[in-house]
From Swiss-Prot:
It is found in: Cell membrane; Vacuole membrane. PANTHER family: SOLUTE CARRIER FAMILY 22 MEMBER. It holds the Pfam family Sugar_tr. The chain crosses the membrane at residues 10-30, 35-55, 69-89, 100-120, 184-203, 218-238, 247-267, 277-297, 309-329, 336-356. It comes from Mus musculus (Mouse). One of its GO terms (molecular function) is transmembrane signaling receptor activity. GO terms for cellular component: organelle membrane; plasma membrane; vacuolar membrane. Keywords: Cell membrane, Ion transport, Iron, Iron transport, Membrane, Receptor, Transmembrane, Transmembrane helix, Transport, Vacuole. This is Solute carrier family 22 member 17. The keyword Acetylation does not apply.
Length: 401
């Protein structure tokens, strides 16, 4: 994953700089092959932007602010969806619409101005680039100090002692092959990747409209999806810090499974209002599950492989989203069987989520050993005091290396 090798900032700037020319070129392409190739490249670049920005937001925050910052980013994305729908209503030409949206992305190259868009200090420390990390942290400390005050002596000493207090090994030897010796990290990756895949794949099963394929149905489905995503962000912001990541993820997937089973078994006996209600409930809960599984994955994957691991989780979510266009290609044939399979997988997710650790208000794991210690407390044995999931959850330090 390039973000783990070349840095979050460099990947974000590179992909943002290429989005504009790629989008404008795709709108100007004359052949269907050129349009498909450039649209594929555009989606690839936007996925890189999404991953890089998500990592930088997460690694910049302290444990108490990670949820709020993640949900704020999701709400900004939902606002972008509403803006796109409004522009699509105004502009009937898709080529003009694509140029209008992607061309201004070139302006994001101004983020490359020194001191404006900073690299992740956490990534720099893990990569043993201590001088660059000290520079980034000093800039952040100076920007956040009260106006007119100098940087305190404690902050200066902390910056000077940064190299001695972070004896991390070089990360160039870390790869997916090295993860084979860390079964707990693999378990968390597989469970959260599978949950994210199902949460994205099952969404189209809850659309109460859109079967006719008319433009009004398309806009209504898009508005419904964006609206339920906004409601899911509000719901997560209210409940997750109170009841924990794992508990709310379990509740969301349970509601997803219940909505699927009701629609599968009682469709012929429900009126339109009940069908719409359970469809909105399933769409809402699947949106919440996708958002929370991504956040939980980013909090249990160590910094040394966070770019690769979170990229894998997001890729599985995007792969699950292909179930809707794949179903349309088959003209709706096998939709019931597909819904049955996805509902069964949702029930399997409910069982697997209980094996995940709780990460509320905890420091991010830095190296593979930290990630291996993040596990669900045993039901039969008292957990050791150095385990990441030890209760109480407030101000739990990372285990000693």
């Amino acid at each position: 994953m390039p973000s783990a090798r070349f840095g979050r900032r460099g990947i974000v700037l590179l992909t943002l700089g290429l989005v504009g020319p790629c989008g404008v070129g795709g709108a100007a392409a004359g052949s269907s092959t050129g349009i498909m190739a450039l649209r594929f490249l555009l989606g690839f670049l936007l996925a890189g932007v999404d991953l890089g920005v998500y990592l930088m937001r997460l690694e910049l925050c302290d444990p108490t602010q990670r949820l709020r910052v993640a949900l704020a980013g999701e709400l900004v994305g939902v606002g972008g969806h509403f803006l796109f729908l409004g522009l699509a209503l105004v502009s009937k030409d898709w080529r003009f619409l694509q140029r209008m949206i992607t061309a201004p992305c070139i302006l994001f190259l101004f983020y490359g101005w020194p001191g404006l868009f900073l690299e992740s200090a956490r990534w720099l420390i893990v990569k043993r680039q201590i001088e660059e990390a000290q520079s980034v942290l000093r800039i952040l400390a100076e920007r956040n100090r009260p106006h007119g005050q100098m940087l305190g002596e404690e902050a200066q000493e902390a910056l000077q002692e940064l190299e001695n207090t972070c004896p991390l090994p070089a990360t160039s030897t870390f790869s997916f092959a090295s993860l084979l010796n860390y079964r707990n990290i693999w378990k968390n990756l597989l469970i959260l990747g599978f949950t994210n895949f199902i949460a994205h794949a099952i969404r189209h099963c809850y659309q109460p409209v859109g079967g006719g394929g008319s433009p009004s149905d398309f806009y209504l489905c898009s508005l419904l999806a964006s609206g339920t995503a906004a409601l899911a962000c509000v719901f997560l912001g209210v409940t997750v810090d109170r009841f924990g990541r794992r508990g709310i993820l379990l509740l969301s997937m349970t509601l997803t499974g219940i909505a699927s089973l009701v629609l599968l078994g009682l469709w012929d006996y429900l009126n339109d209002a009940a069908i719409t209600t359970f469809s909105v409930l399933g769409l809402f809960s699947s949106q919440a599950s996708a958002i929370l599984s991504t956040l939980l994955a980013s909090e249990v994957i160590p910094t040394t492989v966070r770019g690769r691991g979170l990229g894998l989780i997001m890729a599985l979510g995007a792969l699950g989203g292909l179930s809707c266009p794949a179903q349309r290609l088959h003209m709706g044939h096998g939709a019931f069987l597909q819904h049955v399979v996805l509902a069964a997988c949702a029930l399997l997710c409910i069982l697997s989520i209980m094996l995940l650790p709780e990460t509320k208000r905890k420091l991010l794991p830095e190296v593979l050993r930290d990630g291996e210690l993040c596990r669900r407390p045993s039901l039969l044995r008292q957990p050791p005091p150095n385990r990441c999931d030890h209760v109480p959850l407030l101000a739990t330090p990372n285990p000693a290396l």
